[in-house]
């Protein structure tokens, strides 16, 4: 499979993860039911479904830790008052950058994807905010990481 096609599939998976996390965070819907409904309504390859599950469950299970990282990087923006899209985008990106131990997506690819999601689904200022938070986190936590491979 070509890089462009893989990147496009991963972009669609990240959109699905964003929408699932947003729904779960804004409602009382059970995360596993929302995820399974999405997989039923929008079939995808096994690899994409596994990536989606990893992003959704990983970002959700680690949200307390990820939210602390967000608040460290943006102390004037409490996570509880943050727009839901921005919060979900940041949780997904930070999960990929700081926690995901199945595969290591390059920093640049994670940030570019997060900024694109923020532009597509967030407010006028979302992409700048997301880029700023992720830039701060990368400087603080990942400055020594070698990322020579592109997604």
Curated annotation (Swiss-Prot):
It comes from the Bacteria. One of its GO terms (molecular function) is RNA binding. One of its GO terms (cellular component) is cytosol. SUPFAM superfamilies: NusB-like (SSF48013). Involved in transcription antitermination. Required for transcription of ribosomal RNA (rRNA) genes. Binds specifically to the boxA antiterminator sequence of the ribosomal RNA (rrn) operons. Belongs to the NusB family. This is Transcription antitermination protein NusB. It comes from Chloroflexus aurantiacus (strain ATCC 29364 / DSM 637 / Y-400-fl).
